[in-house]
């Protein structure tokens, strides 16, 4: 915990609340003192949605400090269960209330079967699912907590479904389909990215199975294993869940962000590789009960089964299938090259006055790991702009970031201290700054 003038990534409970408020019919209860309850105001101001932010603060005051928190927290959980009837109630402390060192899991267990709020004897069992966000508020930031909370919610409902249907193997959709993981509230242009991702998948003949968590329902999380693969556009949130689904259900995932022409092509080729490995054919229907495909089996599946041709209804993209064998997807000639040469506006923009003014000029990039790495490569490879410094505030993902941007910039900066970023910008005097709101202030 530290006192800061500016924070690139907020405290852990903000990430938990962002995930909870992204789902439909999910309510979050924040066990916190006054002063930590600014999330409602922040989200209402930035998102401009019609519905109220589904977050209730269980305030830690002098009465709580004197008597303990259990009675008040349990009362708030059961009250919201009766008033809102949500599918899920998520309880989270803040870094401040964590100082009390209370076992909130006991409160969750008590709320599931608790005494009536009115003091009458008897049992008043909450109809909603109640979970405690399992996050260390002293060791992780907002993005790490969001990723962990999303994985925890998905794990909770998939294990719940597994207990109800112990002998049932999830069946895949008839047509190739994907889950888009990581679109959530207060994300940087997440809605625009989601629209473009859906358009991209549709052009490739791939259906969208579920979009999690933004606008999704926790009751639909049981449908996640029905998709053929998972698409994770941002490393900051969704990667843990994709790894969990791969481990438990052998679902492959694509974690390449389609930013820029080159990386978009790389992402599409990775999707093509996955679809070909899965043989496009209801590959799991002939497996014995409870059997999971290994990577070796996936890679050798097409040779073993001679890859029967795909039904006509699957051929949404003209030329997606190899014309000779009619067995595998081939997006290279009919989609990637066509988009790159004739559809993309990159060639036009590279000759525009805006881009020419920046050619051979110096630029500084700073942001989260996904966007900073993507923008750095776009500027260096596709626009001919010299990136003198590229940086990120995601210190937990520093190794991946350095691996991505090495060779595309002169210096690499990994820090969450805005003063270091300001000093670097003042020293380099770039012609353009690509960064967060703080870098905008620094540039002025």
Swiss-Prot record:
Cofactor(s) demanded: [4Fe-4S] cluster
Annotated GO CC locations: chloroplast
The protein's annotated pathway: Porphyrin-containing compound metabolism; chlorophyll biosynthesis (light-independent)
Residues annotated as the enzyme's active site: 354
UniProt cross-references to InterPro entries, sorted A to Z: ChlB/BchB/BchZ, Nase/OxRdtase_comp1, Protochlorophyllide_Rdtase
Catalytic activity of the protein: chlorophyllide a + oxidized 2[4Fe-4S]-[ferredoxin] + 2 ADP + 2 phosphate = protochlorophyllide a + reduced 2[4Fe-4S]-[ferredoxin] + 2 ATP + 2 H2O
Protein name: Light-independent protochlorophyllide reductase subunit B
Lineage of producing organism: Eukaryota, Viridiplantae, Chlorophyta, core chlorophytes, Chlorophyceae
